[in-house]
């Protein structure tokens, strides 16, 4: 397995780092995509890996026109370098409703080449008042008992499971990812 992260600190854990390519001022964006693809293919060959796990380098979509948050440009570049088989996405619990997850999945499938395989809902929400006043993305935490209650009432969104990252004793996300990887490895 090859794990590629954007943060330089990831190398402490043995993960590979994409920062030198993404942060390069000497390469055009198209060259960065080619370099990331070459780098990953070299790692897969060298390590005889069956799959590559890649962290999205920025928000995968723009929040609004007031507060720029990366617009998903870097994530789009990464998705061009590595055709994703699966996308596990983190969302605020207030968006963890089947209709929204289904709409996001369709959007990501068009934009990034992969639908959402699973959604992780957290008790973080966007602080819209702060966002409008300062034009800076900020968030706040909703009490866990409130968000857990809301999440427990939401079903899956068209076969897209919605997991709570708040409940640390819930093994379902790990089991879901393990099943996805088993299916992926069986296809090879």
Label the model's feature ranges.
Residues 1-188:
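Flexible phosphate-sensing "switch/lid" loops adjacent to ATP/NTP-binding sites
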């Amino acid at each position: 397995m090859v794990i590629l992260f954007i943060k330089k600190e990831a190398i402490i854990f043995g993960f590979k780092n994409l920062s030198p390519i993404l942060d390069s001022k000497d390469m055009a964006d198209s060259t960065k995509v080619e370099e990331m693809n070459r780098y990953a293919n070299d790692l897969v060959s060298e390590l005889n890996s069956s799959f590559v796990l890649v962290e999205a380098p920025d928000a995968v979509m723009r929040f609004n026109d007031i507060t720029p948050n990366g617009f998903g440009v870097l994530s789009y570049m990464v998705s061009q370098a590595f055709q994703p088989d699966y996308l596990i996405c983190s969302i605020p619990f207030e968006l963890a409703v089947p209709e929204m997850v289904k709409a996001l999945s369709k959007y990501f499938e068009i934009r990034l080449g992969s639908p959402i395989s699973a959604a992780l809902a957290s008790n973080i929400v966007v602080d819209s008042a702060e966002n409008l006043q300062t034009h800076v993305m900020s968030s706040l935490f909703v009490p866990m008992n409130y968000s857990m209650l809301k999440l427990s009432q939401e079903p899956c969104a068209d076969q897209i499971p919605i997991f709570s990252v708040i409940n640390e004793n819930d093994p379902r996300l790990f089991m879901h990812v393990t099943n996805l990887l088993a299916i992926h490895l069986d296809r090879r």
